[in-house]
């Protein structure tokens, strides 16, 4: 096979990152994206790296594993991290973006790169003319999904993922909410809608009896724990939401709060948080309220939240099926397939879960596709780093127990020596070692 370029299929977070990493190393890229010609059920635009679910890249501190992964990616010149930094919106200790401007920035940089040729159209066969990175995501078209399914030995893994509703901020009753971040961490970035016990109980009863949109009859309900529909969470017990998205701790009433309080308590019984969704502050999403309720039910029940009694929903919550591969049996730690070293996969379909993790997999796959192009040995990042631990986990866990995985400190190699008992200090030490090891690895 005469090598002239590398194919990347899919211009989501992973595909955009892979294409950029390949092109910056001087190799021409053919980037295929079907949106703009053929839509998916969940994407709203034809822009690259569209944020379909939340607009958050989660925690930014180095004592948070995803914060460490983001810092590692910054040091590896990630296009996704650069665009994210350029279009941040207030989110306390988290990193959130104006989703439209973020996607537009990635799209523009990819389109303007002289070595990247963007081809709009559906790919129905796995290309054999060049080294290829497939990053088509959980919403892969049926035709290509069949070919990937065949690689998977006919076994399909999937789970259901859901998105939260977005409301027009001008329709929020600001007298009943207050601006605050949990524990006052970072700037005051969230609108908080407090509930007393009576309000919460009424909300809970409405939620567990609400009508859900139907699934296909042959599909079981399997959810990723990190993006579980609020109604499914509620059915696990009346207290479940109080330890999850409606957790009130660290969100005390401000002294000047004029709305109804929960008796003499300083902290509400429950709190619903809303996070800014765009730079203008005209849109807010309901944090942790991903849902599969019918749209009429969403309006009826979510307008029970104080401050949202007259809210206009610019997007209702939706749910979609996410497919992922049997990565322990199919993939090398480099994201190349075991049977064909010229074929790479990246993104959520490999079993990494989350925006940042998907982009990180594209970064690693892109680098290794270039090394394959040059006939060089692949790069395997140290297990002491977040960007090395994640591919190690998804390719070395036991296949029958394989589930999508967010980055976390539990998958990063333990520190040498006695275990540090204080969790924050332990995570700080792991992060310090990770960044040191990454720098040393990059200079070899």
From Swiss-Prot:
EC number(s) in its UniProt entry? Answer: 2.1.1.74
Membrane spanning residue stretches: none
InterPro entries for this protein: FAD/NAD-bd_sf, MnmG-rel, MnmG-rel_CS, MnmG_N, TrmFO
Record-linked Pfam families: GIDA
Q: Which reaction does it catalyse?
A: uridine(54) in tRNA + (6R)-5,10-methylene-5,6,7,8-tetrahydrofolate + NADH + H(+) = 5-methyluridine(54) in tRNA + (6S)-5,6,7,8-tetrahydrofolate + NAD(+); uridine(54) in tRNA + (6R)-5,10-methylene-5,6,7,8-tetrahydrofolate + NADPH + H(+) = 5-methyluridine(54) in tRNA + (6S)-5,6,7,8-tetrahydrofolate + NADP(+)
Q: Where does FAD bind?
A: 10-15
Q: This chain belongs to which protein, by name?
A: Methylenetetrahydrofolate--tRNA-(uracil-5-)-methyltransferase TrmFO
Q: What does this protein do?
A: Catalyzes the folate-dependent formation of 5-methyl-uridine at position 54 (M-5-U54) in all tRNAs.
Instruction: List the subcellular locations.
Output: Cytoplasm
User: What is the organism of origin for this protein?
Assistant: Streptococcus suis (strain 05ZYH33)
Give the record's GO biological process terms.
tRNA methylation; tRNA wobble uridine modification
- Gene3D superfamilies noted in UniProt: FAD/NAD(P)-binding domain
GO cellular component annotations of the record: cytosol
- Which UniProt key words apply to this protein? Cytoplasm, FAD, Flavoprotein, Methyltransferase, NAD, NADP, Transferase, tRNA processing
- EC class of the enzyme, as a word: transferase
**Family to which the UniProt record says this protein belongs:** Belongs to the MnmG family. TrmFO subfamily.
Cofactor section: FAD
GO molecular function terms listed in the Swiss-Prot or TrEMBL record: flavin adenine dinucleotide binding; tRNA (uracil(54)-C5)-methyltransferase activity, 5,10-methylenetetrahydrofolate-dependent
């Amino acid at each position: 096979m005469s090598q002239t370029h590398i194919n990347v299929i899919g211009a989501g977070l992973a595909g955009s990152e892979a294409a950029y990493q390949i092109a910056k190393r001087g190799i021409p890229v053919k980037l295929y994206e079907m949106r703009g010609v053929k839509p998916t059920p969940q994407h709203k635009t034809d822009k690259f790296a569209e944020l379909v679910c939340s607009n958050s890249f989660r925690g930014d501190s180095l004592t948070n594993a995803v914060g460490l992964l983001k810092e590692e990616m910054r040091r590896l010149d990630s296009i996704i991290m650069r665009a994210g930094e350029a279009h941040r919106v207030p989110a306390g200790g988290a990193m959130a973006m104006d989703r439209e401007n973020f996607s537009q920035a990635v799209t523009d940089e990819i389109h303007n790169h002289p070595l990247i040729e963007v081809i709009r159209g559906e790919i129905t066969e796995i290309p054999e003319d060049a080294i290829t990175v497939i990053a088509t995501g959980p919403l892969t078209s049926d035709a290509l999904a069949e070919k990937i399914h065949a690689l998977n030995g006919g076994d399909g893994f999937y789970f259901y993922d859901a998105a939260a509703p977005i409301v027009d901020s001008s329709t929020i009753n600001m007298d009943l909410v207050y601006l605050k971040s949990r524990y006052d961490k970072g700037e005051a970035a969230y609108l908080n809608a407090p509930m007393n016990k009576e309000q919460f109980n009424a909300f809970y009863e409405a939620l567990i009896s609400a009508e859900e949109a139907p699934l296909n009859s042959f599909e079981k309900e399997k959810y990723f724990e990190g993006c579980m529909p609020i109604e499914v969470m509620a059915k696990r017990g009346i207290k479940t939401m109080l330890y999850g998205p409606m957790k009130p701790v660290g969100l005390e009433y401000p002294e000047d709060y004029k709305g109804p309080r929960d008796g003499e308590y300083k902290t509400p019984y429950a709190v619903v948080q809303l996070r800014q969704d765009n730079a203008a502050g005209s849109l807010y999403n309901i944090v942790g309220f991903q849902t599969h309720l019918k749209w009429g039910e969403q309006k009826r029940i979510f307008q029970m939240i104080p401050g949202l009694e007259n809210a206009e929903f610019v997007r209702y919550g939706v749910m979609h099926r996410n497919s992922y591969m049997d990565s322990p049996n199919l993939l090398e730690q480099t994201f190349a397939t075991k049977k064909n070293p010229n074929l790479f996969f990246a993104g959520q379909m490999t079993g990494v879960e989350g925006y940042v993790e998907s982009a990180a997999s594209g970064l690693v796959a892109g680098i290794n596709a270039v090394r394959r192009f040059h006939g060089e040995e692949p790069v395997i990042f140290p297990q002491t780093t977040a960007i090395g631990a994640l591919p190690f986990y998804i390719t070395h866990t036991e296949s029958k127990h394989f589930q999508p995985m967010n980055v976390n400190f539990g998958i990063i190699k333990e520190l040498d020596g006695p275990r540090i008992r204080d969790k924050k200090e332990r995570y700080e030490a792991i992060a310090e070692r990770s960044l040191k090891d990454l720098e040393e690895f990059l200079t070899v």
